[in-house]
Structure formats: C-alpha cells, structure tokens
Amino acid sequence: MVLAGKIYNVVLFILVMKREVWNRIILVGFTIILIAIEFYSLKVDSHYKWDFVFLLALLLAVYFLRDKIKLHPFHFFLLGVFLVLHNLGVFETYSKFYFGIEYDFWVHSYFGFVSALMLYRTYNLVGPYKGWFKYLAIVAIVLGFSAFHELFEYAGAVLLGEGEGVLFIGAGDIDEWDTQKDMRNNLIGALIAIGVYWGYNKFYPKIKPLHKFIH
C-alpha cells in the first residue's frame, strides 16, 4: 500500500508539472530526434535533408507562440510526433501501406487531427468563435493549412521536379487526385478531433487529475 501510494504521488506530480517545463522538454526531445534523422538523411543524401529546415522551423514557431495559442504540452507532443512521422519518409514509408492503407493517408489524417485539437483548445480559451461556428472555423483553418501545404508542394514539384520530401514530387504524390485526397484526409482527422474534444468536454468534464492534465 505504501509503494502504491508513492507511485500514485509520482504520477500526480508528473501530470501536474508546470506546462512550461513540459513544453521545453518536448521541444528539446523532438529537436534531438529530428537532428538524428537529419544526420541519416545527409548520410544517404536524401532530399529529406531539406525538410529538416521546415520541420524544425514549424516546431520552434509553435513553441514561441505557445502563450498566445495556449499551447498544451500534450498537443505539442502530438505535433512533434507528426513531424517525426513525416520525416520517416526518408525510410521510404510513403511508398508503403500500413493496415491496408497507404502511409500518406495516416500522416495527413493525423495532421488534421493534431491541428484541430490545438485550434479547439485555443478557441475555447482565447478565440473569438463560439458555438457551432467554432467548429466551422476549425475545419476551415485546417483545410487552409492543407491548401497551403498543397500549393507549397506544387511549387516545389514545378521548380524542382521528382524526388523525395515536401519540395519534390515522389511517392504518395503521383495520383492525379492527390491534392483532393490529401485535403480530404486532413478533413477526416479534423472531424475526428472535434468529435473527441466535444465528447470529452460533454461527458467527462470532472475527471481528476486527468482533466487538469488534458486541459
């Protein structure tokens, strides 16, 4: 019983640790992971060596905006996972299928999921949108992110041609409906995130200490 009590206290301490500390830990941790993948990309001379610049910039940008967007460490962690999942393309994951579905679907859906979670929290705490319009705004912004990404990819494909990574056209991009499918997948992820957050807020608002950790 004494040991169980100590374990419980440790878990509580971890859950309620200052969010600023967690965000710093997550920033450092995923920076190290991205650097490690970058070394491999340089070693094999993969085009993913250029993606490192954009991924690290995104990670740092979100971190520096953490106060304005009320960034939660759990959401920041999920974003870091997305960045790593994308960069795992250096191992040719985008040309493979997992659970019968192409890798590109999982990554785009996951990005929509994470983005919607972050936006939902921001709008709940500081955003001007309320009610059902909040959900529409989240979907619109996620699709906006997706559209920007597709235009960025298109510009890279036109200027640089075939290759790997976000700047080139390669595995996962050859379908003539790739843009529409990517945006659809982002939308799927966003809708799932909205459903999860809405359901949690409606049915489990009193859970402690997890409520404090998640919110």
PLM feature segments, named:
Residues 175-188:
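Membrane-interface transmembrane-helix boundary segments in multi-pass integral membrane proteins
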Residues 1-16:
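N-terminal amphipathic/basic-hydrophobic helices that include classical n-h-c signal peptides
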